[in-house]
Amino acid sequence: MTTSFWRIATDARTYEADDLSGAGAKITGGRWNEVGVAIVYAASSRALACLETVVHLNSGGLPLNRYLVEIEVPDEVLASAEVATPGNLPVGWDAEPAGRVSISFGSQWAQSQRTALLLVPSVIVPEETNLLINPAHPDAKGIKARKVRKWLYDPRMIRKA
C-alpha cells in the first residue's frame, strides 16, 4: 500500500515537474535545505501544496506552466519517517524568511542519511504536515511521482499591487 503526498511543480529546462531528484531545491535552497543539498518538498494535501506555493508568488502574474504532482510513498517507508513537530524543533524553525535554524536542521538530516523521509510542520499552518524526501537515501527508490494535471491558480489568490 501507499500514501499520497502532493506538490505543485513546473517543468524546467533540466528537470520535469514529477522529478524526484531534488534538483530544484539543490539549485535554489529552501526552508529546510541549503544550496547544494537535494531535497524534494511535498505536502500532505492538495490544498496545502497550493498554499505552500502561492505564498511565493507575487503580483507579477500567475505562473502557467505548473502541474499537480502526486507522490506515492510506500507505507513501510512512511512508517520509518523521522517526525519533527513544533514542540521538538529548535526555536526559530519557523522564522520568516527561513533562517539558519531550519536550513541547518533539514540539511543535517539529509546529509546524515538517517531516513528517506522527514515529516515537518507547515510554517503557514503548523498543525499541517509537509514531507521532505531525501532522494539520496536507498528507500527513496520506491517512491513514485506522476503528473496528475495542469495546475491553474485561481486569480483571486493574487492581489495586484
Swiss-Prot record:
Phenotype when changing residue 44 to A: No change in toxicity
EC number, as in UniProt: 2.4.2.-
InterPro entries per record: RES_dom
Outcome recorded upon mutating residue 122 to A: No change in toxicity
Modifications after synthesis and translation: Consumes NAD(+) and auto-ADP-ribosylates on the tryptic fragment Ala-47-Arg-66 in vitro. Also auto-ADP-ribosylates using NADP(+).
Gene Ontology MF term list: glycosyltransferase activity; nucleotidyltransferase activity
Signal peptide positions (record): none
UniProt effect for mutating residue 41 to A: No change in toxicity
Source organism, top-level taxon: Bacteria
Stated consequence of mutating residue 45 to A: No change in toxicity
Enzyme class: transferase
Keyword RNA-binding (UniProt): no
Role played: Toxic component of a type II toxin-antitoxin (TA) system. Expression in E.coli inhibits cell growth; bacteriostasis is neutralized by expression of cognate antitoxin ParS. ADP-ribosylates E.coli ribose-phosphate pyrophosphokinase (RPPK, prs) using NAD(+) in vitro; ADP-ribosylates RPPK on 'Lys-182' and 'Ser-202'. Cannot use NADP(+). Also auto-ADP-ribosylates in vitro; in the presence of RPPK auto-ADP-ribosylation decreases.
Family: Belongs to the MbcT/ParT/Res family.
Oligomer status and interactors: Homodimer, forms heterotetrameric ParS(2)-ParT(2) complexes.
Domain notes: Forms salt bridges between the 2 toxin molecules mediated by Glu-127 Glu-128 on one subunit and Arg-46 Arg-149 on the other.
Protein name, UniProt field: Prs ADP-ribosylating toxin
Species this protein is from: Sphingobium sp. (strain YBL2)
Gene: parT
